[in-house]
């Protein structure tokens, strides 16, 4: 070929588009990678493909009408965001909640947390080449969805919480299903450990890979299991207890190295801690009403503002609501954990191999729709 048709090679850096769709993420993520051979020299995440305008919708709807949106921010832990929004509005309006409703919310929230972690576990291991654990995890997750479906009527987007309580009460079948599942999942731990935790290939793919230092975590606002894997024992349920979490005995799993393996171990141990919370809540479940019937249908909180933080499956999330005394919020802002968890990767991916990028992205457990919202 004549030389005039050949572009001169002036540098060794070239750009690779990872995405905008990739199995290691939930949703549409695009990462621009500048590569020097097999090594990443720069990573630039591009977000916004899934923007739906949830915050603006929240400001143009009644407080109650925004409830279905909250389950669709992070659709893998929709109950947790639904729960957090209701708690924020109740704090803003000064609404008391019956103890039974608080316990029911907590039980369902922890089931939703386990379901989210199981989906992450199955898909992450499959990204690294392990197909069998994926089937095991989804089988167990399916049973949680059946439990939540029994009481909420939905398997993914729940909208079960109400201002002042919950939509309907639980029955003995729910508690029996919950206790049976606790026994079943605990009997599965040896299988998961044998297939994954002690798998030498999995260990080599994750140990020392994608290290997040405590300084980087603080700088980028990393929260949740990714923060605790760095050795920082911060969990909103312990640091700023809400609902009835201060009545339960549970531990905060932490790592030491901040690598992908520690992030895996922290999430795995968190599932056991959630089982402990559910067990204690079932044993102490009080009687009485499940709903405060004095809450008006057309709620008008007094003028004021509230910032309410809670622990979602991916870290600390929060609602900032401003009321001007009307049935709709003047301002509705949502803090999501995946935003900080994503952008710390601009530092973490630098200097790593392209082959490790998938392992690192998957270990952080991103849900892109909650970032774009």
Swiss-Prot record:
It is found in: Cell inner membrane. Its main location: membrane. It comes from the Bacteria. GO terms for cellular component: plasma membrane. The keyword Transport applies. It is a peripheral membrane protein. Its EC number is 7.1.1.-. Belongs to the complex I 49 kDa subunit family. NDH-1 is composed of 14 different subunits. Subunits NuoB, C, D, E, F, and G constitute the peripheral sector of the complex. NDH-1 shuttles electrons from NADH, via FMN and iron-sulfur (Fe-S) centers, to quinones in the respiratory chain. The immediate electron acceptor for the enzyme in this species is believed to be ubiquinone. Couples the redox reaction to proton translocation (for every two electrons transferred, four hydrogen ions are translocated across the cytoplasmic membrane), and thus conserves the redox energy in a proton gradient. This is NADH-quinone oxidoreductase subunit D. It comes from Syntrophobacter fumaroxidans (strain DSM 10017 / MPOB). The lineage of its organism: Bacteria, Pseudomonadati, Thermodesulfobacteriota, Syntrophobacteria, Syntrophobacterales. The gene is nuoD.
């Amino acid at each position: 070929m004549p030389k005039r048709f050949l572009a001169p090679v002036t540098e060794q850096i070239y750009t690779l588009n990872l995405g905008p769709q990739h199995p290691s993420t939930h949703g549409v993520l695009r990462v621009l990678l500048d590569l020097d051979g097999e090594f990443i020299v720069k990573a630039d995440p591009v977000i916004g493909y899934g923007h739906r305008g949830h915050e603006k919708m929240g400001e143009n709807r009644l407080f109650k009408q925004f409830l279905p949106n909250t389950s669709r921010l992070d659709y893998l832990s929709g109950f947790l965001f639904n729960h957090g929004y209701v708690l924020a509005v109740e704090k803003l309006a000064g609404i008391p909640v019956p103890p039974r409703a608080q316990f029911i919310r907590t039980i369902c929230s922890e089931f939703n947390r386990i379901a989210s972690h199981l989906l992450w576990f199955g898909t992450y291991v499959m990204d690294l080449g392990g197909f069998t654990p994926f089937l095991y995890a989804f089988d167990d997750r399916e049973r949680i969805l059946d439990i939540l479906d029994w009481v909420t009527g939905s398997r993914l987007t729940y909208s079960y919480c109400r201002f002042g309580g919950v939509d309907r009460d639980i029955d003995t079948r729910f508690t029996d299903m919950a206790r049976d599942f606790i026994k079943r999942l605990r009997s599965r731990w040896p299988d998961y450990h044998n297939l994954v935790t002690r798998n030498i290939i999995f260990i080599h793919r994750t140990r020392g890979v994608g290290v997040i230092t405590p300084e980087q975590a603080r700088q980028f606002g990393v929260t949740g299991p990714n923060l605790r894997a760095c050795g920082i024992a911060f969990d909103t349920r312990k640091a700023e207890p809400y609902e009835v979490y201060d009545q339960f005995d549970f531990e905060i799993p932490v790592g030491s190295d901040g690598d992908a393996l520690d992030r895996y171990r922290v999430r795995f141990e968190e599932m056991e801690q959630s089982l402990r919370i559910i067990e204690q809540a079932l044993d102490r479940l009080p009687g009485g009403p499940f709903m405060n019937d004095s809450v008006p249908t057309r709620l008008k909180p007094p003028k004021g503002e509230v910032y309410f933080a809670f622990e979602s499956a991916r870290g600390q999330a929060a609602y900032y609501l401003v009321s001007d005394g009307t049935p709709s919020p003047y301002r509705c802002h949502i803090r999501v954990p995946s935003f900080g968890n994503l952008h710390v990767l601009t530092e973490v991916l630098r200097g790593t191999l392209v082959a490790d990028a998938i392992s690192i992205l998957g270990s952080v457990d991103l849900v892109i729709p909650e970032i774009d919202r």
